[in-house]
Curated annotation (Swiss-Prot):
LRR repeats lie at residues 52-73, 75-96, 98-120, 121-143. It comes from Xenopus laevis. This is CCR4-NOT transcription complex subunit 6-like-B. GO terms for biological process: mRNA processing; regulation of translation; regulatory ncRNA-mediated gene silencing. The lineage of its organism: Eukaryota, Metazoa, Chordata, Craniata, Vertebrata. Mg(2+) 2 binds at residue 405. Its cofactor is Mg(2+). It is found in: Cytoplasm; Nucleus.
Length: 550
């Protein structure tokens, strides 16, 4: 788990008392440390209302018990209970996951609640001078004994077998009963690759629940239960694509396409098995494959660097990729018994999937990777829609669905770019780095176009999960936010509904510090939406050609 800097409390416990003048002038008092001493036998219930406390000194008293209410002090980083008469600890102490130091020296403790294993941020655990059982002492006295003991307790903590509550289906629009349309469902899911699921990153999760053999069952159960027509997955390990995902989904009537990150090209056969990438699966009953493409961002960065050091040193060094499939829609359009105009033409659908760079310090890289990907998709669509002797078709001529782990929040330049059709070439996410000369290569105007201060893409996209329908798609201890998205071209597609969030009250009641969790197999929540595809050419009704829907 990434460790924030922790400064232990000053042992001198220096304090100042405000003067009458400071009080009169409205100066606010601030105290987040408290010491209680004097051979105290019991604690006032009002203590547990001081939820702002970060440090609590309760040593050298005559306390024989600590009530479960200790869990209310959720900001505590330091708790000293040394030299008391404690014979047991409340299991609820394990919910104070902010703790960095827990001192229990010189008490009467024989056993410890396994719930202490949840204190994954602890850096100091004092247990000396307690008549603890030999199995606890044996672990504790080993090299790195504190960590081994906490891991042992977490791994052996019983987990309630209760089922996850069902996520609600949120209906946003009824299916069009007049105009012809085809409904289809799309899933987007970052499954958390095995090599990234480490105790260092996810210290709050038992090791057995991080193990891929355990997690893959929950992941496949979720994919199967969603039963989507199109499935976009990120962080799919190469070997798992061929041994798990593709065989299991092929049995259920899917075909698929997968590409690993670019680094796989320079690895041995054994090493490349563990490289992750992006996969798209589609139900063959509804779609057939026309084209498939892999977009390697580092190659595009190198080809379009235009002398920009930032492009070479920051963008080209990241080996993220995107994939796309051009599909032919099998299902006939229907609505009030009508067939679409130009029904002899194939109805195509572009589906794309990408996983952008993760580091928050590289907002410029995420934005440029997104621009490169969308620019490539625009070229693919225009080429697929072109006809001999006809002008270059509009990029919106083929319906388009984009699934991605963008590693970017809704207020980012990445989401602004996709939603609004472009961003300013001096957007703050570029970090004032010198990209201007190469960014025009990815804009609608092209390299030789007239500069207008914006980088645009020409698509008309909308997010399926608008209006904060999901409070977060990634849920870890250190970060909770929306970084996964499904976008669709609003010229041809409507969203009918989406799968809503997991009940936040359940998360709270079960003290879910972060995911993965024994009941939740990834650190991401899947997205699922039902979309409605309308044909680009609408039929004639009573001699009148219906106008465009937008």
């Amino acid at each position: 788990m990434p460790k924030e800097k922790y400064d232990p409390p000053d042992p001198r416990r220096i304090y100042t008392i405000m003067s009458a003048e400071e009080v009169a002038n409205g100066k606010k008092s601030r105290w987040d440390e408290l010491e209680i001493s004097g051979r105290v036998r019991s604690l006032s219930m009002s203590l547990w209302s001081l939820t702002h406390l970060t440090v609590l000194h309760l040593s050298d008293n005559n306390l024989s018990r600590i009530p479960p209410d200790i869990a209310k002090l959720h900001n505590l980083v330091y708790l000293d209970l040394s030299s008391n008469k404690l014979r047991s600890l409340p299991a609820e102490l394990g919910n104070v996951v902010s703790l960095r130091e827990l001192l229990l020296n010189n008490n009467l403790l024989r056993v410890l609640p396994f719930e202490l294993g949840r204190l994954f941020r602890l850096q100091t655990l004092g247990l000396k001078g307690n008549p603890l059982s030999q199995d606890i002492l044996g672990l504790y006295q080993e090299p790195d004994g504190m960590r081994k003991l906490l891991n042992y307790m977490l791994d052996n903590l019983s987990v309630h077998p209760e089922q996850l509550p069902q996520r609600p289906w949120i209906t946003l629009k009824e299916r069009d009963q007049i105009l012809p349309s085809v409904p289809f469902t799309v899933m987007c899911f970052n499954v958390l690759c095995d090599k990234y699921a480490t105790r260092q990153l996810y210290g709050y999760c038992p090791s057995w629940a991080l193990n891929w053999e355990y997690r893959k069952k929950g992941i496949m159960e979720e994919i199967v239960s969603c039963d989507a027509d199109i499935i976009s997955l990120q962080e799919v390990e190469t070997e798992q694509y061929y041994t798990l995902f593709m065989p299991a989904l092929k049995e259920r009537g899917y075909d698929g396409f997968f590409s690993p990150k670019s680094r796989a090209k320079i690895m041995s056969d054994q090493e490349k098995k563990h490289v992750d990438g992006c996969a798209i699966f589609f139900r063959t009953e509804k779609f057939s494959l026309v084209q498939k493409h892999t977009v390697e961002f580092n190659q595009i960065a190198m080809a379009n660097s235009e002398g920009s050091e930032a492009m070479l040193n920051r963008v080209m060094t990241k080996d993220n990729i995107g994939v796309s499939v051009l599909l032919e829609v099998h299902t006939d359009f229907s609505g009030a018994g009508m067939k679409p105009h130009h029904s002899s033409e194939k109805q195509l659908l572009m589906v794309a999937n990408a996983h952008m760079h993760w580091d928050p310090e590289y907002s410029d890289v995420k934005l440029i990777q997104t621009m490169m990907f969308v620019s490539e998709l625009k070229s693919i669509i225009e080429k697929a829609a072109s006809r001999p002797g006809s002008p270059t078709p509009d990029s919106n001529s083929i319906p388009f669905v984009l699934c991605a782990d963008l590693n970017s929040l809704p207020d980012s330049g990445v989401v602004e770019y996709l939603t609004n059709g472009g961003v300013a070439d001096n957007h703050k996410d570029f970090k004032e780095l010198r990209y201007n000369e190469c960014l025009t290569n990815f804009s609608c105007n092209g390299k030789n176009g007239t500069p207008d201060g914006r980088i645009t893409h020409g698509f008309q996209l909308r997010s399926a999960y608008e209006n904060n329908l999901m409070p977060y798609t990634n849920y870890t201890f250190d970060f909770k936010g929306v970084i996964d998205y499904i976008f669709y071209s609003k010229t041809h597609i409507d969203v009918l509904g989406v799968l809503g969030p997991l009940d936040p009250q359940w998360m709270m009641d079960n003290n879910i510090a972060g995911c993965p969790h024994p009941h939740i197999p990834s650190d991401h929540f899947s997205l699922l939406t039902q979309l409605e595809l309308h044909p680009p050419f609408l039929p004639v009704i009573n001699g009148v050609h219906l106008p465009s829907r937008r």
